[in-house]
Amino acid sequence: MKKVIKRLLVLLALVITSVGLIACNEKPTPQPEPIVETEQFTVTFDTLGGSEIPSVKVDKDSKLTKPANPTKAGHEFSFWFLEEEFEFDFQTPITSNITLKASWTVNEYTVTFDSQGGPEIAPVVVLFNGVVTQPETPHKPGSGFNFWAKEDGTEFDFASPITDNLTLTANWIELTPEQQIEEDYQAVLASFVVSDMELNVPTYGPIHGSRIVWNMNSPYISNSGVVLPLLEGTDPTVVSVSATFRSGTTRVKREFNVQLKAAQPVVLTNSRAVEFTNLTTEYDILPGTLDLWFEEGGTVPYVNPENFLRLIEGFVDPEMLSIMQFTYEAGILTIYYPYFVEEENHTYELTTVIDSVNQTITTRDPGFYWAYAYSTETNYGRNIEYMDETYPGYSYESPETGLVYDLGKYNLQIVDKAGEILLPFSLVNQLFAGSSYYNVFYNGDKLVGIYALPDEGSDEYNAMMDTSLRGTQFSPDLVVNNFNTLAFFMDHFYGLKEYYGIATFYDLLFEKSSIFLSTEPKIFDGALGQLLHKSIDELHTSYGYPSYYNEVGYAGQVITKINDFGPKVGGWYQNSLWPVEDAISSKWGSTAARPNYWFLNTEKTHGVITLDSFRTRDLYESITFDNTIVQYIMNTQETLVPAATGTKFFFYNTGDQENDQVEVIIKGAAETYFNDYKALLEAAGYTYVFQASGARPVGYFTKNIGGIDYMVVANYDAEFEVFYIGIADHLPETYSIEWPVNATNVSGLINGDSAVYLEFTLDKMTAESPALTHVTLDITYNTGGNIGALYRVVGFITSEPFRTTSITADTGSKSSSYIKIVNVPNYGPLKWSLLVSGVSFSAGNSMATIFNENNLGPILGIRTGGGTSSITPILLPNGTAFTMSSNSMNGIRSGSGTELDPYVYTNNEAGITPDYQLGVDALYDEASILAILNGHIWP
C-alpha cells in the first residue's frame, strides 16, 4: 500500500511540473541563484607539551566549542589563552585564525625528612621534575650522619627529579668519643669568630654536647668571648686560645687562633630620640628629648655635648647657656663662655676643646665644668661667707697646663659625623654634669635626671630601673666600652690614685679582666664590688647598686661579713668603730642612750656636746616672721598665714617634687601662744578642724586660697620651748591618716641640721649652767656628713674667718682660703676643745683638720680615721653605680709662704694626730678629759 501511495505522489509531482512549464512557455528563462560559501577560520590548539588537541574550523562570527581538557604529566590543566594570564572566553565570536595555548599549573610534591632522633627538619615542597636541596647535615649526639635514604634503604640522589611525594630517612652511624669531639670542634671552629669584639665560646659542643673548658691565655679575651681591642701602644698579635673538649673520659685539647687588633673607628649609623624626665627637686628642668647615636647593632649611646647641655637647662644656668658659644670646625668642637666672679671683680674666659682628630678634650681651667651650674634649690650655703683672695693668708698654686683628657689611651672615641661632634654618653654626663652631682641616667629606654645617687626604693631609683633590658645580657660593644670607661673614670676622677701608688687602674682591671669583660651583669657587679671593697679598700669608695640589666630583685654586691672588706676598712671596723661602740655602751648602756650633752664636773663649768654627724636641711633663718620666705618655699604670691611673734625663726622647706610645704620653728614664743595664733588664723579666714579622739593634741586649720586648700598646723613644743607652724598645699585624705605637716616633728627638724641642733643644745646647756666656760665637741662617733654643715658648726667655735686647705688631685692645684660664718648666736667667751677617735672620718676628719690648722683648741683622743676626699657618684655605661673618693681633697698647709719656707700642702688621708692621747677606755672618762683640759695652756 505504501509503495502505491509513493508512486502516486511522484506522478502528481510530474503533472504539476508539466503544467507549469506549459503555462510559462512565453516568459524568459530564469537565471539560477548564486551559491554563497560560508567563510571559516581555523582554531589551532597548542597544548605546550600536553596531549594533542586537533585544530577545528569555525564559521566566521561563530563561537568555538570548548574542547576536552588536555593532559600533561605532573601538571594540572588551567585554561586556554591567547595572551598570557588571560583566559580565553569561548563565548567570543571567531573572526580570524587563532592559536589557543594551554595554561598549566605544575604539580607540587612534599619531600618529608625523618631524622630518626636528630633535629627536626621541615618538609620541603618541590615542583614536578624539580630537585630538592639537600638540607644542612643534621647532627645527633653520639652519632654521625651517613646519608638520606629512600624507602628501600638506598642513598637518595639529590639530583633526581621529584615526581611524587617522598619521605627520606636519615641514616646514622655510631661515633667514637674522639669522633664526637672532632665534630664538635669543627662546628665551634666554623662559627668561632663573630666579630672583632666577640668570639663564640660555648661551654658545650653544639653537636654532641662535649663539655668545653676554655683557657683564653690573654687578658684581652674574656671567658664570655668578649675581645678587648688593644690599647694604644700595643702591637697587633695573634694569641692562641685553648679549649679542652671532654666526652666521657676522653679529653682532647684544641687551639684556636685569635687576631688581637687595635680599636676600629666608631661608625655611627642609627639615631634615636630618647625621652628625658627630671626627677630631682634640686633643679627645675623641663622634660625633653635627646638624640642618641649608635653603631649598627650596637648599644653604646653617643651624644653631642651641646645638645646635652641644652637639654639640662636649669642645671645649667640659663644665663650662662645663653652666652655659651659652640664652634664646630675641622673635627673640633670648642665651647666657650665668660664667667664673672663678683667678689673678685674678675671675668674668667672658660673654654674646652673637644678634638676628634687627636682624640683629646682639653680644658685650661677645670672650673669650666662647674661654673655654669645653677645653684641647687636646697639652701646648703646659708650663713657661709667666703673671703676673697685679698684676705691675709689666702694662697693658690696651680700648674699652668690645665687638664687634658687623652681618650685615645682608653679607646674612647670622639666621632666627627658630618661636622657634628659626638662622644660616649656616659663620658659627657660625667664631665658636664656628674662632677656637680647632677646625673642624667640612661637605662636603654629613657633618660632620667637625678641628684647624686637616689636611695633604693625611691621614685627616682624605681624610674631608673624601669627598663625593657631587665634580665638580659650586656652586648659585647657595651662590655668593651664599660671596661674602658671604668678605667678612664678611675684614672681621672679617683682622687687617691697617686696616694695609693696606682699608675693606672688598667693594671687592676686586667688582673681580673675576664670577669670585668663578662656579658653576665651579675658577674660584672660582683667583680666591681670586689674591686671597690677588697682592692681599693677605703671607706669613701663603695658599691652603690647594680646594673639595670640584672633581673628585678637582684640587690648587687651586699656586704654581709667583715671579710667582705679589705684589711684597711675591715681594720677600721675592728680597731676603731667597734671598740668605740663598746666604750659608749659601757658608759651609757648603748649608743642610742648617749646624751646630747653632759658635764665633766659637778660645777658644770666643763661640758661635752655630742655631734655624731654633720647634717644639713634646706632652711632659712630670720629674726622676724618673713612671709616672703614662706611665699618662696610655697611657690605662691599669696600671703598664706599671718605673721607670728618670736625672737628667731627657722623656715624649713620640707616639700617634694609634687607638693610644697614649709615648717617653721619659732624661738621666743610663750607656751600660751597657740590660742593667740589660733585667733589670728581664724581672723584670716581659716577654719579649725579638730577631732577629740585623743590621737592628736591639736587639729589643723584650712582655707582655700587661689583654688588651693591649704593646711596649717600650729602647736607649742615644751621640750624645745618653741612654737611650731606647718603649712602644706594639700589636706590629708582623712583626719586619722598621716598628715603632711606634723607638730610632733620638731625634734626631727632640729636634730636634722647640725647648726640648729648645736644652737638648741647650747641654749639648754647655758640655761642649765650659766657657769659654763669650756665646751668639748665630741665627734668620736662622727663618720662625716655635709661640708656646709661642718662649716656652720665651726661658726659656733670661732667668730673669726677660719682657714680651709684644699688640694685638687687631677690638676695639682692647691689653695688655702678663709670662711666666715654669720648669724651665729653669741654664747660668750667659751673655750672649745675637740674629742676624736679613729671613727672620726671624712667630715669628722675635716673638723679635726680645721681645729688643728686654725688653733681653735686642743684635740683629745685617738688619731682620726682619715677620709680626705669628698665623695663623687659614678654611673657606668651599663648602669652600675658606685661612689668614690673624688679629686677634691681636704688638707693642711704648713710653712710661711716665703722662698725659704714655702707653703707645703698635705692631704689628711692619714688622719689627724690629737694633741693629747686618750685610750679608747678613757675616751668618755670625765676625770681623764678634765685633767687634760685643766692642764692645757689656753691662749
Where are these regions (language model features)?
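Beta-rich interaction/scaffold domains
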Residues: 26, 104-106, 167, 171-266, ...
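Flexible, low-complexity junctional segments that flank or bridge functional domains
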Residues: 339-631, 656-659, 666, 670-672, ...
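Secondary-structure capping and domain/repeat boundary segments
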Residues: 32-192, 197, 239-263
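C-terminal motif of bacterial Sec signal peptides marking the signal peptidase cleavage site
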Residues: 20-23
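Bacterial N-terminal signal peptides that target proteins for export
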Residues: 2-9
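C-terminal "post-core" interaction segments
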Residues: 455-473, 480-483, 487, 729-748, ...
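Compositionally biased P/S/T/G-rich terminal and signal peptide-adjacent segments
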Residues: 265-285, 398, 623-663
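Extracytoplasmic Gram-positive cell-surface binding/anchoring modules and repeats
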Residues: 58-71, 126-139, 288-326, 411-427, ...
